[in-house]
Amino acid sequence: MVDTCFLSRGLTTLAGLLLLPFGSLAASQIEDQAEQFFRSGHTNNWAVLVCTSRFWFNYRHVANTLSVYRSVKRLGIPDSHIVLMLADDMACNPRNPKPATVYSHKNMELNVYGDDVEVDYRSYEVTVENFLRVLTGRIPSSTPRSKRLLSDDRSNILIYMTGHGGNGFLKFQDSEEITNIELADAFEQMWQKRRYNELLFIIDTCQGASMYERFYSPNIMALASSQVGEDSLSHQPDPAVGVHLMDRYTFYVLEFLEEINPASQTNMNDLFQVCPRSLCVSTPGHRTDLFQRDPKNVLITDFFGSVRKVEITTETISLQPDSGVVESSYKKDQMVEELMEPLKYAEQLPVAQIIHQKPKLKDWHPPGGFILGLWALIIMVFFKTYGIKHMKFIF
């Protein structure tokens, strides 16, 4: 009997030792999968959207920026991760036939200047200096959080710019310019300070491709609406407003983005094809040599949408609850109902009495010394002015 017991215990121990490596291997595989899942790419997305133009005839540039702003918000990037810079307020311009609105299509169905637009830099705050400070993080400590780009080395950043430009420069409010060298150096500072993981640069301006020619920092993908020597043309003229409502390149990019949802598998190669020369009239360009990943493996939502740490599975998972847990939960709910039963606040409050009760009459108090003195002064002035003989006309 004793030998049998020892034999059984020995077999159990041997089986445990044999299964231990398999259990450790399974646990190790699960840990590796979890680590790979949370280590993938980036953890947050940011957007810096800049309109550099002022004056009414540049209405389309404000509409461009606000339309991109609406698209990235729709795809999940919150306002806390968007820095919006508008050089002019077209919604409140005296020439606007529909005040407090900005439209990007001549059918006037969608107001892109809605109630939830949060402009971080407006009017004369939109300068080259402020733009570069936002990118590099070299801003005063008193600057509010909404005006900061609080990105890190796990951040994917979308930078969209629109306005008037030339070969190697972009104008800010017709008063200053940013060159492609200054922009390239700012991106290098961002990389050295670990302020981005990957960066997507989009510019809609004349000769836009010249702005990304000097880039040299890694993990940057750039798109432009026109090549060097070409103009970026406008779109959607509206007789009521008196100007064009959008630029061609941004119009077709946004038309493409309207078909995207947060779970979309559309990649960047599709974005490169949205505005051929037949539609844009100009020749859009892109640069991917600094980018480490193949554009066909880069999802649109990697830059335009929110980061969702969700993994879809087709496995069947049993959700049979423990009977003891169910019973305990039932008892807890029953106790809560018993506690809440007598607390019928609406019936306890004497609402009718409070609303309809008569106002309390104030007790009468004799006038103070100041009031009596004031009346005495009035009577003295009266007698001094009119005398006793006029009293008969009063009484």
UniProtKB/Swiss-Prot annotation:
Activity regulation: In the absence of proproteins substrates, exists in an inactive state with a disrupted catalytic site by an autoinhibitory loop. The binding of proprotein substrates, particularly the CSP region, to GPI-T triggers concerted conformational changes that alleviate the inhibition by the autoinhibitory loop. Meanwhile, proprotein residues near the omega- site induce the formation of a catalytic cleft for catalysis, following which the products are released and GPI-T reverts to the inactive state.
Residues the record marks as active site: 164 (proton donor), 206 (nucleophile)
Membrane protein topology class: Single-pass type I membrane protein
Gene3D superfamilies to which the protein is assigned, alphabetical: 3.40.50.1460
Cytoplasmic side: 386-395
Pathway connected to this protein: Glycolipid biosynthesis; glycosylphosphatidylinositol-anchor biosynthesis
Post-translational modification note: The disulfide bond between PIGK/GPI8 and PIGT is important for normal enzyme activity.
Enzyme Commission number(s): 2.6.1.-
Chain ranges passing through the membrane: 369-385
Domain of life: Eukaryota
Lumenal side: 28-368
GO MF annotation list: GPI-anchor transamidase activity
Signal peptide span: 1-27
Record's keyword terms, sorted: Calcium, Disulfide bond, Endoplasmic reticulum, GPI-anchor biosynthesis, Membrane, Metal-binding, Signal, Transferase, Transmembrane, Transmembrane helix
Binding of Ca(2+), residues: 79, 82, 118, 120
Localization of this protein: Endoplasmic reticulum membrane
Keyword Metal-binding: yes
Chain intervals for the UniProt region annotation (Autoinhibitory loop): 231-236
GO BP terms: attachment of GPI anchor to protein; GPI anchor biosynthetic process; proteolysis
Ligand binding (a protein): 206, 232, 234
Stated family: Belongs to the peptidase C13 family.
Subunit structure and binding partners: Heteropentamer. Part of the GPI-anchor transamidase complex, consisting of PIGK, PIGT, PIGS, PIGU and GAA1. Interacts with GPAA1. Interacts with PIGT; this interaction, via a disulfide link, stabilizes the expression of GAA1 and PIGK and links them to PIGS.
PANTHER family: GPI-ANCHOR TRANSAMIDASE
Free-text function comment from the UniProt entry: Catalytic subunit of the glycosylphosphatidylinositol-anchor (GPI-anchor) transamidase (GPI-T) complex that catalyzes the formation of the linkage between a proprotein and a GPI-anchor and participates in GPI anchored protein biosynthesis. Recognizes diverse proproteins at a C-terminal signal peptide (CSP) region that lacks consensus sequence and replaces it with a GPI-anchor via a transamidation reaction. Transamidation catalysis reaction follows a two-phase mechanism.
Protein's recorded name: GPI-anchor transamidase
